[in-house]
Amino acid sequence: LRDLHVGVIFLLLFCVTNFGYSQNLVVNPSFENFINCPVKLGNLELDVEDWSMPTLGSTDYFNGCSEAMGTPKNFNGQQPADFGVGYVGLYMFAPNDYREYIEASLHSTLEKGERYTISFYVSLAERSDFAVKEFGIRFSEFPVQIETSKVLSSMHFSKLKGDTSNELEIKYSKFYSDEIEWIKLTQEFVANGTENYLIIGNFKNNKRTQKFQTKRKITKGSYY
């Protein structure tokens, strides 16, 4: 699958803040705190502190300390990190509904009824064939671990313990097709009071995913 370069996106610097307070509630928001310097694909949760993969999808971690999984240059192209030297990469769109996600823990449970802002930066990998139009965010009360490498659907979440009902979708007027600059995504939301973790990715199957073909290739994917 790594040779498909279907819809790859790089993610950098996550932030969840309460209105009126500037404290970032995401632990290790820019992926700078790592356990191991990355040397292979799909090893994010063993390499990065406080981040995990909620499914069997093999999300990647890149850091300037590594030759094999380095920044700014790696197997998916070249992209410097604006904050430090680390970022992650995942498939937002790929054949057979294959998906990759990342899960973060929050410093504290969000307060019920309070307004928050979530923001993060994305950049389409140079070797991607497709760009997507929207990013999904799902909050959960407990850590999520589901035995699938395909789309995380509402059916999956309905079977989990705890509240997973707070979900967001950040849409863009165009498509997230910039391969040079980091694009900032921001969304406001009201907390349920049960949010301890957040998951980022594409929660729609291929048929429902709004996408734009950036290159004419036989392979079909979107990696960021």
Question: Where are each of the predicted segments found?
Answer:
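Short coil-to-beta strand junction motifs in C2/discoidin
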Residues: 130-136
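Bacterial Sec-dependent N-terminal signal peptides
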Residues: 1-26
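Short aromatic-acidic-glycine turn motif
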Residues: 143-150
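Serine/threonine-rich low-complexity intrinsically disordered regions
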Residues: 2-5, 127, 147, 156
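Aromatic (Trp/Tyr/Phe) and Gly/Pro-enriched flexible surface segments
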Residues: 23-112, 121, 125, 132, ...
